[in-house]
Amino acid sequence: VSYETKVKQALDICFNKNYFKGNKNEKAIVMYSGGMDSVSLLWNLLEHTEQDIHVHSIHIDNSEGRCKAEAEAILDSINYMKKNQRPFEFSSSVYSLKAQYPGGKDMTLALFQAMRVSSAISKQFNIVYTGDYSIGREEGAEAQGVLNALCTNRRSKPIWLAPFEEMTVISLERSKGIYLSMPEELREMYWSCRKPTEVGNGFVVCGECHACKRQEALRKDLTND
């Protein structure tokens, strides 16, 4: 299987395990950060399924200071997919907490907000997608618990799917599959750095966070290939 089809393969495995068909009767919300994983996931869902897709971005305004950089990546990549893919819905929200530490776990916030969106637009989703993988037991349990709690008075509850968990556990190989499974234009639009510095009209990556190190390893490997 070529790298370009790795994400499609992961989606197929995910659907088979959870009895989904990928058809237009299935309603899904994609939690979208503008990073490499969520950008590739959204493109592949639009490309390889007929699911009714709603995309939601949370602008996380915290001590890491990446909110503006991510917002630009979200704007650029969503506009690209609006022009080059089938129709989908988009919404966004802001979570702001300026303290010494970011505070809390991203997955818990993502699943909480997914169900808030469901209530706000009066739409029952079958699936909540996130582009994460290797989610720790504690974080996964906390996030799933929040999702369950927010479905207390609902007749149905969406299933949380993280398709990239079906890919290889070898980090670099998985990254290559995610990266190469989207168009070249989108590869130039996503944002990864957790602690960027704003300079003039742009942003400079820190080069030290785990996301920057992942991107550096990916670039080196692709250059060697």
Feature roles, as predicted:
Residues 2-225:
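Nucleotide-activated chemistry modules centered on ATP-dependent adenylation/adenylyltransferase
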